[in-house]
Amino acid sequence: MLKHILIFLLLQYSVAWTPGSWRHFQKYDKQMPKYKSKAKLKKVQEHLSKQAPLVSADECKLLKREIENAGRGKAFLFMGGDCAESFDQFSTNHIRDLYKLMLQIGILLSYTTGLPTIKMARIAGQFAKPRSYPFETLKNGTEILSYKGDIINDIDIEKRAPDPKRMIDAYHQSTQTLNLLRAFSYGGYSDVHRLDHWRLKDGFLTDNSYYRNINLAVRFMNALRISDKDPVMTQTDIYTCHECLLLPYEEALTRNDSISKKTYGCSSHFLWVGERTRSLKSPHIEYLSGVHNPIGIKISHKCSNDELLALLRKLNPDNEYGKITLITRFGVDKIQDHLPRLIQTIQENRMFVTWCCDPMHGNTKSIGDYKSRIVDDILEEVLQFFEIHKEHGTVPGGIHLEMTPELVTECVDYHNVTKETLQDNYVSKCDPRLNAHQVLNMMEDFADFYFDEFI
């Protein structure tokens, strides 16, 4: 198998990289839409290529340095947000509430680990979704195209034809979202002296001792005459991330940095390649091999040791720190069998990566007519992830969660949300998300574990 991988890599290197060289590998793709009009697609791409980048090269460089710190155990990475953004649920209030939730989790993780928390939101670009099947069958037997995210088509069964103009809508929504995030981050909203202002309708740290202890820590810093106007106390950085799936959109927002002359994907600070698109011959790997953003690779039990090494050599040929984040998604029943072998492979080959645990995707179950996840399984996979890294002397760099500040009933916690109450407020268009109450309770349980095992 390794021989075939190496031969394929040699063939790939014969193609000079450009933002559009992924098209040479398009025949291997099973996820991108087939647009009826290539002329309309080209027109949309030309329009987007003339628009301002959503993020800057300098922001991407800073994030890469921070992710390097997470890989070295000097920072902690938290990735969180909706499974998929939507056009109809977009609102200032939703973005503000997700921001509040990120702040609460961030400060709890920093208090727990004693490390700065890198906050990365699945937002301002997380519109496209891979699907297992290109078609779905309605109850009447009619076969229609699968919904693949608002940037591609509509959840409405009458509007499933892919429309390239939806990329323009996604770009403008992302622009508004980033404007709000930057205003919140640098306008005093994230001031740690205003913890009470981070309150949500459901889910807040004030219900436990952690809130009191964090407030006491802030009070102590004030006693040391650390200025309450210091930017460390009043400002924060929120980075954006999404799956690199819809390559015509990514290509149109690719830019060259005028200073370094390097190429960046300017649709987001951080791009990841998913389980379904990380094949060595996929166009997504080809595109990501040429941009200088920090990159994530989702890996499951299906990823072999040789495949992982080949991916790293393709996407990070210079073995740079901070470039690659390995986002593991095994499931609670498989992590013990597969994470150790991959850690050992990385150690033996002296690869530099940051490890991050995605405990969501490997724990998805069908419960009646709904896809759901059991909170206890999600937490248990996180705890096993940390225990395994501790056993191997490696750094567990971060956690990745699908979550929402809304009071949804999509994941089962055996307390407020049961199998019978899933239908009460199940609104996700794709995968089930933790609600604010669930995610904060889970992070508090993680904090208890961390203090017992790592402090």
Residue ranges of each PLM-predicted region?
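N-terminal amphipathic alpha-helix/helix-capping segment at the start of soluble metabolic enzymes
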Residues: 20-31, 58-74
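N-terminal signal-anchor module of multipass membrane proteins
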Residues: 31-46, 51-59, 75, 80-81
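Active-site-facing alpha/beta catalytic cores
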Residues: 74, 84-85, 89-331, 373, ...
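Non-transmembrane, aqueous-exposed alpha-helical and coiled segments at domain scale
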Residues: 323-327, 332-355, 361-408
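Sec-dependent signal peptide recognition
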Residues: 1-8
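Glycine-rich, charged/polar anion/phosphate-binding loops
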Residues: 62-64, 281-284, 340-342
